[in-house]
Amino acid sequence: MADILRKIEAYKREEIAAAKQALPLAEQAARARDAAPIRGFAAALRSKHAAGQFALIAEVKKASPSKGLIRADFDPPTLAKAYEDGGAACLSVLTDRPSFQGAPEFLTAARAATNLPALRKDFMFEPYQVFEARAWGADAILIIMASVSDDEAINLSETAGELGMDILLEVHDEAELERALKLPSPLIGINNRNLRTFETTLETSERLAPLVPEDRVIVGESGIFTHADCLRLKKVGISTFLVGESLMRQNDVEAATRSLLGLQRNIEAVS
């Protein structure tokens, strides 16, 4: 996986350099500061918890490196609205093109179709990308601790903080968790996918969750397919989940979202 991350970083650095040539940092930062007002990402998750519900970060995801094309009829606004109607708290939208067939316009369009906060799901290395994310409408960013140094994580975190954005810190093991807990973000994502084998097991969340202080919000990532999986993770204090592929493969995304969350469809009285 280290080799894969190095390849990803290499093409990302090239992307960033090209983007800076097309739109210098100062101009990108200005666009970020003129973007639509922030929607509170962490606040939306906590609001669901306060109502006694699971909080879902629903992912708009066309493809992945390991699975290839996930959804052929891919329309981000329609999918985002289905997630919102199904009870999701927030959106996660892939913007990485080479590995996930993502795009900035997917993020902008998905967010515009709903009232939900949105996270830019990408491999983040430089503050320039944070300004990009905000300019495109993102309310939060992802920092994958396995792919950045401590200094890079701090720089990304500080830039996001200056823009009022929330940050999801993704970890895969104890060492990454220890590093993430030194950063101020309350959102700790535990990815259940093994970076070496690509296998997923909820035991990763069950092992790491007890190590996370109670004032942080733990987000379970990968390997979550059913309401039973949500209930299993609730036993170790996880009530927030990031789910993409399993929902993207369903014909009725709204119904699948409700089923995952254990919500019943609202039935309006007919007078």
Curated annotation (Swiss-Prot):
Keyword annotations from UniProtKB, A to Z: Amino-acid biosynthesis, Aromatic amino acid biosynthesis, Decarboxylase, Lyase, Tryptophan biosynthesis
Spans traversing the lipid bilayer: none
Associated pathway: Amino-acid biosynthesis; L-tryptophan biosynthesis; L-tryptophan from chorismate: step 4/5
GO molecular function, one term: phosphoribosylanthranilate isomerase activity
Catalyses which reaction(s): 1-(2-carboxyphenylamino)-1-deoxy-D-ribulose 5-phosphate + H(+) = (1S,2R)-1-C-(indol-3-yl)glycerol 3-phosphate + CO2 + H2O
GO biological process terms on file: L-tryptophan biosynthetic process
Pfam family, one: IGPS
InterPro entries hit by this protein: Aldolase_TIM, Indole-3-glycerol_P_synth, Indole-3-glycerol_P_synth_dom, Indole-3-GlycerolPSynthase_CS, RibuloseP-bd_barrel
Known EC number: 4.1.1.48
Broad EC category: lyase
Coiled-coil residue windows: none
UniProt cross-references to Gene3D superfamilies, sorted A to Z: Aldolase class I
Family: Belongs to the TrpC family.
Protein name from the UniProt record: Indole-3-glycerol phosphate synthase
